[in-house]
């Protein structure tokens, strides 16, 4: 068993973890960055970057639909779902590449790839053969979407907001469960791109004006 000692161990190499690591180094302390999954922040890989790319395509389609009202007649709008998603993934991967480069620029002695767990206060087990001793531990693991048990019986037909950007083509129809920011953004974008969208929400009335307009 290999034992490594640092002033601070940071679990998670996303935006928060990277910021914590840099802050520790800026104060002259030793730090290690631990990541069990692929490098690339939530924003770049499955969050704001790919979602805004999908929204940009949706806004282009929506603008073309609304153009006749301004005296501009572009003709029938044809949406190529495969081309839309190919561009989303291509640009997303480019953004992720910048993040990966940033992580990989860190001294290899100060970054570990593996899942960490506490075995005692100030002691982490990383993978099968590394222990990390640290005076302080920053937990910046983020979160993952959860599928309710009653929906898991639908198998592969159920996807999360993380999965939508891996599709090769736009779906013909989709049921969006949840009217939060993510659900509304994706639901509106897909609807503007020709997807039949049904929105399911627990609240009867939404008072926030922007969300009302989106619905």
Go through each PLM region and give its residues.
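Cofactor-binding loop segments of dinucleotide-utilizing enzymes, especially the Rossmann-like FAD-
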Residues: 13, 36, 179, 202
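Rossmann-like NAD(P)H-binding beta-loop-alpha module
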Residues: 169-199
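Glycine-rich flavin
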Residues: 3-6, 22-29, 34-170, 203, ...
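N-terminal Rossmann-like FAD-binding beta1-loop-alpha1 element of flavoenzymes
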Residues: 8-32, 185-191
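Glycine/Thr-rich phosphate-binding loops of Rossmann-like dinucleotide-binding domains
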Residues: 19, 147-149, 185-186, 215
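Beta1/beta-strand and adjacent pyrophosphate-binding region of the FAD-binding site
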Residues: 2-14, 172-177
